[in-house]
């Protein structure tokens, strides 16, 4: 969305989910813990570092060093890759200790910059990017961010990502020259959103992923 950001993406995402829920007559859906999810109620916004801190019982900040984070992971039996830095460790701690427990709609925000290379840097806090993931019923439904539109900074980030690809990181991104060339011609400020339609259908119908995944025969096993 041109001239949007992560906050306009929140509004758009909530509207999309609610419109779909109202269309099928299910604005209240059953939750995995036996409770109910009222999609028309308030949606929470929570910084990822705060959620990880709550799970660990100790404060974790953007400046917490790698050895300290690895000690936390060891204490909670969270396995880590040797190549991971602080940002990747924070995300793994979140995914292993927190994500499944987020039943009510929650925008998990303020990710460490290294794990969201296509997002703008945070407008207030150094070391973070303006990005979020929407979690409902313990499942990631949609990621979004304030799009990075500076081609110089984007090239630096993608070059760093390509080095991670060379080291075998399966989640890193390749350098995309066509994308960078297009950005050099000019890109307005924008918000970006990716909605998991199959997961939205799962939420609203109670069906499993086998019944909702789009074009399953084209997906790898």
Locate the predicted segments by residue.
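Short, amphipathic alpha-helical segments
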Residues: 3, 7, 11, 42-45
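Hydrophobic, well-ordered secondary-structure elements that form the walls
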Residues: 108, 144, 196
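Composition- and surface-driven signal marking solvent-exposed, interaction-prone regions
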Residues: 10-13, 120-121, 213-215
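Metal-assisted phosphate- and nucleotidyl-transfer catalytic regions
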Residues: 16-139, 160-187
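Short, glycine-/Ser/Thr-/acidic-enriched flexible segments
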Residues: 1-4, 112-115, 123-125, 139-141, ...
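Active-site pocket scaffolds in enzymes
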Residues: 151-205, 209-221
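Hydrophobic (often cysteine-bearing) scaffold residues that line and stabilize catalytic clefts
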Residues: 9-13, 86, 90, 150, ...
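Class II aminoacyl-tRNA synthetase-like tRNA-binding/catalytic domains
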Residues: 1-8, 18, 71-78, 202, ...
